[in-house]
């Protein structure tokens, strides 16, 4: 009698958390921790957290009207002349970006551009 009561109580205590826990595949989306773009799902990139600069999280790419930053591709591999030349050659803004992003925003979605809308303010807008 007592063991069945304990079993029922244990079931009542453990069942709600089990029902509210997401499947194992979705757990990465909740934490969002990443190191590089390929670890994030489609339409997202791995960007620096706003709150803790040493952590990178999966962040959605910019949609029309979202604020953006023109240097979202900036990484911290060397600052020499060779690196600047390489950056000039690869102007395409692709995701996944294999470097480490140094800003908290992702590039705009394909077909959009990060355009200056006012002094020191950039927004994702349709490319002309």
UniProtKB/Swiss-Prot annotation:
Renumbered residue ranges of the record's region Disordered: 71-95
Disulfide bonding pattern of the chain: 34-46, 40-58, 45-106, 68-114, 108-124
Family per record: Belongs to the AVIT (prokineticin) family.
Species classification: Eukaryota, Metazoa, Chordata, Craniata, Vertebrata
Gene this chain is encoded by: PROK2
Organism: Bos taurus (Bovine)
Protein name in the entry: Prokineticin-2
Leader peptide range in chain numbering: 1-27
Gene Ontology CC entries for this record: extracellular region
Superkingdom field: Eukaryota
Pfam families hit by this protein: Prokineticin
GO biological process, one term: negative regulation of apoptotic process
Keywords: Biological rhythms, Disulfide bond, Neuropeptide, Secreted, Signal
Compartments in which it is found: Secreted
Biased composition (Basic residues): 83-95
Parts of the chain that traverse the membrane: none
